């Protein structure tokens, strides 16, 4: 298939649960990519974790051959994208390799904030966006209202949007027909020198680095010598091929196609995502515009439970970073937890997923500290520094001004839940920026402190709106705020891993809530354990985990009171001595208590 006019590269944009992976399954089934017995739900969500949570985390690609009604067989390269707000980076990578995108919208629920954000990304990248209404078989489906919403909220013409039901397979052939006519063919020249963009790469223990690429110009085949532009290293191609959805080797990959290249690269960072590949004979090919490096929003410390695992942990992180380039990490050490890494994530879901992948795929036991965001500090000597770890905060006397990151949040919510959402935003110290009424939905824009958003905002937004509100946010600016560092002291000793940076107005409340929570989680010892929350030198809250005590008077039947007093005094002295030398083991749950403060 050397003719580019028969190739269509597209991806699907959709909100979580709008039926993206199911539609992909139907495409694979209709184009005969898998035998009946191999067909299973969510073929592309290959990670166990993706299946359990029912979300797509990684971008995947599939090449299908579809015989259209005009008798021509088209090669469809379909790149699956995640729908969750934490994985926008994966989406922008997938879109960079396509000429078009299907915007899949649930005909019952209507447009959600996340699809709006991803759709704008697609339009900015110059893609042809084709609306598809899914779940048309549901009783609550209302295609006319949803078409109107698409036009009002996103601003693309949806009057003749295709309707289908991915679950029953109704109308899916119509989607494929429309796709072939609407989405433009790729441009590129097979005769030009090779120029290919790495969309994704992952590490295979046997094959080395496997890279998913989109070839812009030229061709690449087994035995070619390829040059990685960013590292300048040359590798020999072992095999090229496509996923349909199984690994299938082909003779070559040509301009306009999407497939994989295996070149025996053993260095984990040998083929970074967003990089350009070319042949070693034409090293001066232009670098393709990659994707913008995305900045992590949330930081947390990850520590192996046993210090022997530290090296394995480092290696696991390196392999994960290859596959998920939005993860960043630097080594750190903590008095309470030993050596570990400070990792940067895109959001809380991303953090949970990474931790779970480390524990499952690499068999590690990890302790996570409470997540924090980056604060900007203006010091009295005129310096500006950025702090992502409360225990690294300089002395308050040296700080002129503390600024916290503010995010601009777009929330789409049905009118009947608007009041609850506004109350939640005000409680989270939000400032309303804008409000638009779009049919039965309302789009509210708030400026919220990121510190309040990362912990539990998403969950609480869903629960106050019965799951109907959807959220999309991006970093906006740093703004001065009255922030303080809240330390937790256990038996008079500061535990660095439990420190928090909070707003002064909430400090007393947070301190009280945190000490109460810790009291439930720290097991009782043989001596009293005092848990205190302090701001600077001032203690704002205290609770005590009461000691377990043996009844030393049990053996005195009657007898003299002085005998009893002697035994009690002796016990008291023992407890006092124990308290001076005793250590308190802090369980993992206690470190995460910070997350579960019902603010």
Swiss-Prot record:
Domain tr-type G: 5-187
EC number per UniProt: 3.6.5.n1
Entry keyword annotation includes Cell division: no
One function term, GO molecular function aspect: guanosine tetraphosphate binding
Lineage: Bacteria, Pseudomonadati, Pseudomonadota, Gammaproteobacteria, Pseudomonadales
Subcellular location: Cell inner membrane
Source taxon at top rank: Bacteria
PANTHER family in alphabetical order: TRANSLATION FACTOR GUF1 HOMOLOG, CHLOROPLASTIC, TRANSLATION FACTOR GUF1-RELATED
Record: residues binding GTP: 17-22, 134-137
UniProt record similarity statement: Belongs to the TRAFAC class translation factor GTPase superfamily. Classic translation factor GTPase family. LepA subfamily.
Major localization class: membrane
Reactions that this protein is recorded to catalyse: GTP + H2O = GDP + phosphate + H(+)
Keywords attached to this entry: Cell inner membrane, Cell membrane, GTP-binding, Hydrolase, Membrane, Nucleotide-binding, Protein biosynthesis
Origin species: Pseudomonas fluorescens (strain ATCC BAA-477 / NRRL B-23932 / Pf-5)
Biological process, per Gene Ontology: positive regulation of translation
PROSITE patterns the record matches: G_TR_2 (PS51722)
HAMAP family the record matches: LepA
General function of this protein: Required for accurate and efficient protein synthesis under certain stress conditions. May act as a fidelity factor of the translation reaction, by catalyzing a one-codon backward translocation of tRNAs on improperly translocated ribosomes. Back-translocation proceeds from a post-translocation (POST) complex to a pre-translocation (PRE) complex, thus giving elongation factor G a second chance to translocate the tRNAs correctly. Binds to ribosomes in a GTP-dependent manner.
Membrane topology: Peripheral membrane protein
GO cellular component annotations of the record: plasma membrane
Identification of the protein by name: Elongation factor 4
CDD domains, per database record: EF4_II, EF4_III, LepA, lepA_C
Database matches in InterPro entries: EF-4, EFG_III/V, EFG_V-like, EFTu-like_2, LepA_C_sf, LepA_CTD, LepA_IV, P-loop_NTPase
């Amino acid at each position: 298939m050397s003719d580019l006019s028969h190739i269509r590269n597209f991806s699907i944009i959709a909100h979580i649960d709008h039926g993206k992976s199911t539609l992909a399954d139907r495409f694979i089934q209709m184009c005969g990519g898998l035998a009946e017995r191999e067909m299973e739900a969510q073929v592309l969500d290959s990670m166990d974790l993706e299946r359990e949570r029912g979300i797509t985390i990684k971008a995947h690609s599939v090449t299908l051959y579809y015989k259209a009604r005009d008798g021509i067989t088209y090669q469809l390269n379909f790149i699956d994208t995640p729908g969750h707000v934490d994985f926008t980076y994966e989406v922008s990578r997938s879109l960079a390799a396509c000429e078009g995108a299907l915007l899949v919208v649930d005909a019952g629920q209507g447009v959600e904030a996340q699809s709006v954000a991803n759709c704008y990304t697609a339009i900015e990248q110059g893609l042809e966006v084709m609306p598809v209404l899914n779940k048309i078989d549901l009783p609550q489906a209302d295609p006319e209202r949803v078409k109107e919403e698409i036009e009002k909220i996103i601003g693309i013409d949806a009057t003749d949007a295709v309707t289908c039901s991915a679950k029953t397979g109704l109308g899916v052939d119509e989607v494929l027909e429309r796709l072939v006519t609407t989405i433009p063919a790729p441009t590129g020249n097979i005769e030009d020198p090779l120029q290919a963009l790495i969309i994704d790469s992952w590490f295979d223990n046997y094959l080395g680095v496997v890279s998913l690429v989109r070839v812009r110009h030229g061709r690449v085949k087994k035995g070619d010598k390829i040059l990685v532009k960013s590292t300048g290293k040359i590798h020999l191609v072992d095999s090229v091929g496509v996923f349909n959805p199984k690994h299938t080797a082909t003779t070559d990959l040509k301009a306009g196609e999407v497939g994989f290249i295996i070149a025996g690269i053993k260095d984990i960072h040998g083929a970074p995502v967003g990089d350009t590949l070319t042949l070693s004979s034409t090293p001066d090919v232009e670098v393709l515009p990659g994707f913008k490096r995305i900045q992590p929003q949330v930081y947390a410390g990850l520590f192996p439970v046993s210090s022997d695992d530290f090296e394995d942990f480092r290696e696991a992180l390196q392999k994960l970073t290859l596959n998920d380039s939005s993860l960043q990490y630097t080594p750190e050490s903590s008095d309470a937890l030993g050596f570990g890494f400070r990792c940067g994530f895109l959001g809380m879901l991303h953090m949970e997923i990474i931790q779970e992948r480390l524990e499952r795929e690499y068999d590690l036991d990890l302790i996570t500290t409470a997540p924090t965001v980056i604060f900007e500090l203006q010091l009295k000597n005129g310096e500006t520094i950025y702090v992502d770890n409360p225990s690294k905060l300089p002395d308050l006397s040296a700080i002129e001004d503390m600024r916290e990151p503010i995010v601009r949040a777009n929330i789409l919510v049905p009118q009947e839940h608007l009041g609850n959402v506004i109350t939640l935003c005000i409680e989270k110290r939000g400032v309303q920026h804008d409000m638009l009424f779009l049919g039965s939905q309302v789009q509210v824009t708030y400026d919220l402190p990121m510190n309040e958003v990362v912990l539990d905002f998403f969950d609480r937004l869903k629960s106050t709106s019965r799951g109907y509100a959807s959220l999309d946010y991006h970093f906006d600016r740093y703004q001065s705020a009255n922030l303080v560092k809240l330390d937790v002291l256990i038996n008079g000793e500061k535990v660095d891993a439990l420190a928090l940076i909070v707003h002064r107005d909430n400090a007393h409340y947070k301190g009280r809530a945190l000490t109460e929570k810790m009291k439930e989680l720290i097991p009782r010892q043989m001596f009293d354990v005092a848990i205190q929350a302090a701001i600077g030198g001032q203690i704002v809250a205290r609770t005590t985990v009461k000691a377990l005590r043996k009844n030393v008077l049990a053996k005195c039947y009657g007898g003299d009171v002085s005998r009893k007093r002697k035994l009690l005094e002796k016990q008291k002295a023992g407890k006092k001595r124990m308290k001076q030398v005793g250590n308190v083991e802090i369980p993992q749950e206690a470190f995460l208590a910070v997350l579960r403060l019902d603010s």
